[in-house]
Design a protein with these regions (language model features):
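Subtilisin-like serine protease catalytic core
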Residues: 1-252
Length: 252
């Protein structure tokens, strides 16, 4: 079998042209999953660059941000899986609790129309005014995040810190997509590509499948607005919820 590849692509600067250029470079190196941990406040311009997310058999994932209620690009693109964050509390006995992280981004776009997959058939969705993010979530709170080795420039001392943010939850979801692609290839299927139609249309709208593949996050807040509190079914903080990876992978 072909070994997995992780390729780091760095844009020369944070300008829109450079970021779009980096995405197009990933397309040229594809197929695969593109994990994006950058974001800019959405605007009327966002639709003009959506064509960058048109690579064949490519899955695009982006962080929703770490500043509470907000809508940013590229997460707001209908072709991008917007990944929010949770706070995970766990013990050595295997028990855990999970709530929406207070820093997770998310909200209703002021510019992007409601995509076809965000329908009233999705539990908790209602009738969205426009594109609503996030789509899904994963552990992102730095206090419950991933221990990471860091070395200060000029120092030879390695320290361990607990890293977090939706820049942590997004690559975790990208890893799931990569595993799903490997499983699909073994089964003679095409790569997953844009995951939204399957996650929303074939999983979230089927009660038993949704319950087995996602943990629905029903508590936690990231602001003071009416939609800023997690609830049963879809919400802007955690989307459909966090994955039950084993079950989700067999459903993808």
């Amino acid at each position: 079998p072909t070994l997995a590849r992780i390729v780091l692509i760095e844009a020369p600067d944070p300008s829109l042209n450079s970021l779009v250029g980096a995405i197009k470079l990933a397309n040229a190196m594809g197929p695969g999953a593109v994990s994006m941990s950058f974001g800019a406040t959405e605007g009327s311009w966002t639709g003009s660059v959506d064509s960058a997310f048109g690579g064949t058999n490519m899955s695009y994932l982006a962080a929703t941000g770490d500043n509470g209620t907000e809508v940013s690009w590229p997460a707001v693109s209908p072709k991008v899986l917007a990944v929010g964050g949770t706070t995970l509390t766990y013990s050595g006995t295997g028990s855990r609790t999970e709530v929406a992280w207070s820093g997770t981004g998310g909200g209703v776009s002021a510019y992007t129309a409601t995509p076809s997959y965000q329908t009233s058939a999705v539990p908790g969705m209602g009738s969205p005014l426009r594109r609503t993010v996030g789509d899904v979530a994963f552990n992102a709170d730095p206090s419950s995040g991933q221990y990471t080795a860091v070395m200060t420039p000029g120092s030879s001392t390695v320290n361990w810190i607990s890293a977090g943010g939706t820049s942590l939850s997004t690559p975790q979801w990208a890893g799931l997509v990569a595993v799903s692609n490997a499983m699909r290839v073994q089964l003679g299927k095409t790569l997953l590509g844009q995951p939204h139609p399957m996650l929303y249309g074939q999983i979230a709208t089927v009660a038993g499948t949704y319950a087995s593949t996602f943990k629905d996050i029903t508590s936690g807040t990231h602001g003071t607005c009416g939609a800023c509190t997690a609830k049963t079914g879809f919400d802007q903080l955690t989307g459909l919820g966090t994955p039950n990876a084993g079950s989700l992978l067999t459903s993808l």
